[in-house]
Design a protein with these regions (language model features):
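Cross-family detector of peptidyl-prolyl cis-trans isomerase
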Residues: 2-8, 20-172
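Bacterial N-terminal signal peptides
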Residues: 9-17
Length: 172
């Protein structure tokens, strides 16, 4: 009788283990992922806010300095001083001095960082901006909120929906 209990227990344990490895059914390729109306509303609101921010930043940047260029992904940049070092690309280890401020000039952060490009260790706008630089460059990036800390911010230092100015120097 004891042997039967052991066999049944072992059998149930094996069935339990095997059922855990079963793949979940996939969504058919002809059906899209359903989103509710609240999600769509929030998406539309954020897209409209991003468009308004882009228009506002364009106005601010062009009033400030017409030598700024707009990147493909939406931030503004200006290389102040061109270095003679290697171009920065993914997997490059670089050391930068970085001053972060709001559009009205309030300095939020001023420090030296060492980072590996492509590892998402800094906000998207800064990482993509650094890829436009060479070692030895000094640059200014004006990064919209959606390429910085987004709608959540980085409280208490950076409020939600805050566009930022990064003044950077890339060391050799």
């Amino acid at each position: 009788m004891n042997k039967i209990k052991q066999v049944v227990t072992l059998l149930l344990f094996c069935i339990l283990i095997l059922s855990c490895n079963r793949q979940r059914p996939q969504l058919p390729s002809n059906k899209g992922v359903e989103t509710d109306s609240n999600t769509l509303s929030l998406l539309t609101i954020n897209q409209n806010l991003a468009k308004k921010e882009d228009a506002y930043l364009k106005k601010v940047v062009l009033q400030k300095d017409k030598t700024f260029k707009k990147s493909e992904i939406g931030f503004w940049y200006k290389i102040d001083q061109s270095g003679r070092g290697q171009a920065i690309k993914d997997s490059t280890i670089c050391k930068i001095s970085c001053q972060v401020s709001t559009l009205n000039g309030k300095v939020l952060q001023n420090d030296i960082k060492q980072l590996v490009i492509g590892k998402k260790l800094v906000v998207t706008g800064l990482e993509e901006g650094l890829k436009l630089c060479k070692k030895g460059d000094s640059a200014i990036f004006i990064i919209p909120w959606y390429l910085a800390y987004g709608m959540k911010g980085n409280e208490p230092l950076i409020p939600p929906y805050t566009s930022l100015i990064y003044k950077i120097k890339v060391f050799n």
